[in-house]
Amino acid sequence: RIPKVQQLLKDYFDGKEPNKGVNPDEAVAYGAAVQGGILSGEGGDETKDILLLDVAPLTLGIETVGGVMTKLIPRNTVIPSKKSQVFTTYQDQQTTVTIQVFEGERSLTKDCRLLGKFDLTGIAPAPRGTPQIEVTFEVDANGILNVKAEDKASGKSEKITITNDKGRLSQEEIERMVKEAEEFAEEDKKVKERIDARNSLETYVYNMRNQINDKDKLADKLESDEKEKIETATKEALEWLDDNQSAEKEDYEEKLKEVEAVCNPIITAVYQKSGGAPGGESGASEDDDHDEL
């Protein structure tokens, strides 16, 4: 109906003229009727071969350590859609995690929009990074979002339902958020990389501390001087982290290399001596490396 749009379509399709044989208002009404028939299951043979796609207008995700927007359902994902991801705890003996649900395209949740939150309690006390919390996002055909968090060890779970009529964004607001994400993409990337570098260092250090104090892992396999070296290196790294909250990505990466240079040779030698094989020199395989809540 809009001449400019017609021209853009023509240019996009290499000069091919758009089909103007259908009244625009009738096209909208027809599409709505077909979609209604498909969703209700009453379309019969006339709609069985017709596919109408609806998509998530903005990325959906949760907040993880450092205020990071961890994405579960990306923008423009065809709905209905379902996605699960396993997360873990950030602190030792942590028995509760807060699931904060956001929509938006930025790397940090402070620049996205909070949709809702809930707590999962009753997690068995364990060292940081041990519990496995499975978070599931499910968007139905009506755009209603169901979020569930389950502790895989105990089976305890909590959930929240977010409907698409409770203050959700207008099309103009959605377009503004997408535009802002594009505008700040490079800046957001640098901030995210810095947070990831800090989290990698922190996770490695705590993993080392847990391993050398766990009898099922390294506690009974290390010589006293070896254990002392690792304890000293990890203690100094944690003190450095406390004193350098705003360090750059390269600083965190350099500090991680320093700690690895002390710990990895000791860990490798212990496993070789015992005839075992370390699950990666950091002591954790990629499959066990989960974002922290």
Swiss-Prot record:
Membrane-crossing residue ranges in chain numbering: none
Intracellular or extracellular location(s): Endoplasmic reticulum lumen
Motif, Prevents secretion from ER: chain positions: 290-293
Cited PANTHER family: HEAT SHOCK PROTEIN 70KDA
InterPro entries assigned: ATPase_NBD, HSP70_C_sf, HSP70_peptide-bd_sf, Hsp_70_fam
Free-text function comment from the UniProt entry: Probably plays a role in facilitating the assembly of multimeric protein complexes inside the ER.
Residue ranges of the region described as Disordered: 270-293
Tagged with keyword Endoplasmic reticulum: yes
High-level lineage: Eukaryota, Viridiplantae, Streptophyta, Embryophyta, Tracheophyta
Native source species: Nicotiana tabacum (Common tobacco)
Family annotation (Gene3D superfamilies): 1.20.1270.10, 3.30.420.40, Substrate Binding Domain Of DNAk, Chain A, domain 1
Family per record: Belongs to the heat shock protein 70 family.
Cellular component per GO, a single term: endoplasmic reticulum lumen
Protein name: Luminal-binding protein 8
Pfam families assigned: HSP70 (PF00012)
Keywords in alphabetical order: ATP-binding, Endoplasmic reticulum, Glycoprotein, Nucleotide-binding
Signal peptide (residue range): none
Biased composition (Acidic residues): 284-293
Glycosylation sites: N244
Underlying gene: BIP8
GO molecular function: ATP binding; ATP-dependent protein folding chaperone
